[in-house]
Swiss-Prot record:
Entry protein name: Inner membrane protein YghB
Pfam families: VTT_dom (PF09335)
Localization per Swiss-Prot or TrEMBL: Cell inner membrane
Record's keyword annotation contains Transmembrane helix: yes
GO cellular component: plasma membrane
Record topological domains on the Periplasmic side: 39-67, 182-191
Residue ranges, Cytoplasmic side: 1-17, 89-160, 213-219
Length: 219
């Protein structure tokens, strides 16, 4: 817990030298890995702020806190392993009350978007779906429920994971290298630190609203 507090303090104070400490940065990697794994892998955790964390990772690479290739490798593994977990949920547990309950709690618009993409584009939907929050967690579950073979799924899983992580992280890095952004570096880093927290709170509140509405309608 003390290390987490140190990381938050270093981010808030823009102390990149402290963040670059090997022990501290290893915890940063772990937190990012766990967040992406859970967001991609578990339907109840689909509100976690994966995209904004990748933007933050790109900004930290620009500050020499993290290194590009190891970051891409670690976060791609997190996203792809999480996506595999989502696929396994659909393949093995798709007809259980638990998974059906998770699916029922997600907003209907994401069900419709994921179903439309999967029906129209099949596995190619995984490539585009990675860039859509909630949808990237739903699609692998739907692929598992449909009985799609693990071998075919894994190819598109790892390819889409690599594309998503590389594109969004690179965008965060490129954004941090723009002269205007460099001149307002402190404000940008503060924004990138607050954004995942704000999205997390918004996701939690949105999920609670959906759950309460469904319980009220079923009462």
């Amino acid at each position: 817990m003390a290390v987490i507090q140190d990381i938050i303090a270093a981010l808030w104070q823009h102390d990149f030298a402290a963040l670059a400490n090997p022990h501290v940065v290893s915890v940063v990697y772990f937190v990012m890995f766990a967040t992406l794994f859970l967001e991609n892998g578990l339907l109840p955790a689909s509100f976690l702020p994966g995209d904004s964390l990748l933007l933050l990772a790109g900004a930290l690479i620009a500050q020499d806190v993290m290194h590009f290739l190891p970051t891409i490798g670690i976060l791609t593994a997190a996203a792809s392993l999480g996506c595999w977990l989502s696929y396994i949920q659909g393949r093995w547990l798709g007809n259980t009350r638990t998974v059906k309950g998770w699916l029922a709690q997600l907003p209907a618009k994401y069900h419709q978007r994921a179903t439309c993409m999967f029906d129209r584009h099949g596995l190619l939907a995984l490539l585009a779906g990675r860039f859509l929050a909630f949808v990237r967690t739903l699609l692998p579950t739907m692929a598992g429920i449909s009985g799609l073979s693990n071998r075919r799924f894994q190819f598109f899983n790892w390819l889409s994971g690599l594309l998503w992580v590389t594109v969004v992280t690179s965008f965060g890095y490129a954004l941090s290298m723009i002269p205007f952004v460099k001149r307002h570096e402190d404000q940008v880093m503060t924004f990138l630190m607050i954004l995942p927290v704000a999205l997390l709170v918004a996701g939690l509140l949105g999920t609670l609203v959906v759950v309460i509405k469904k319980k009220y309608c079923n009462a």
